[in-house]
């Protein structure tokens, strides 16, 4: 079966301490939006020994708080970091080694909009 437009929320599994075997999901595009920890990008890079579209080829990690730069770089760092893997929001800054916090004045919304546009453009090809 093919299911379209799905979101997987793992939070209840973690919260309840449930043991769940790994889920296998096939997708043309994945949006990494796990926030500061950028968990999806970290796991994908580590387990597959791949290079990400970052200056170091890996997850760089966040820098200290800078409201002004954090706001703008959140949108700038929203991109495809590996074929089919897109990053947005604070995960975008974490992956790219930019500043934490700050994007509270629209940067998060603009990052999400940019991610959606990038994904739609890729899927339309």
PLM feature spans:
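Solvent-exposed alpha-helices and their adjacent loops that cap or buttress functional pockets
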Residues: 17-18, 22-25, 74-81
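Glycine-rich phosphate/nucleotide-binding loop
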Residues: 56-79
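A conserved FAD-binding loop/helix module that cradles the flavin
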Residues: 95-123
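Short, small-residue-biased leader/transition segments that mark boundaries at the very start
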Residues: 2-3
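Short glycine-/small-residue-rich Rossmann-like dinucleotide-binding loops
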Residues: 10-12, 35-36
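Short FAD-binding loop at a beta-strand-to-alpha-helix junction that anchors the flavin cofactor
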Residues: 79-99
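Glycine-rich beta-alpha-beta "Rossmann" dinucleotide-binding loop(s) and their flanking helix/strand
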Residues: 20, 36-62
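Short hydrophobic core segments
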Residues: 24-35
């Amino acid at each position: 079966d093919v299911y379209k437009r799905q979101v997987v929320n793992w939070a209840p599994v973690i919260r309840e301490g449930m043991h769940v075997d790994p889920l296998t999901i096939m997708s043309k595009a994945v949006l990494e939006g796990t926030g500061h920890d950028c968990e999806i990008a970290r796991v994908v890079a580590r387990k597959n020994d791949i290079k990400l579209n970052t200056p170091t080829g890996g997850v760089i990690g966040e820098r200290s708080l800078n409201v002004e730069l954090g706001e703008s770089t959140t949108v700038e760092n929203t991109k495809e970091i590996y074929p089919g893997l897109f990053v947005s929001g604070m995960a975008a800054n974490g992956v790219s080694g930019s500043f934490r916090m700050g994007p509270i004045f629209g940067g998060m919304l603009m990052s999400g909009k940019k991610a959606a546009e990038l994904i739609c453009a890729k899927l339309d090809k």
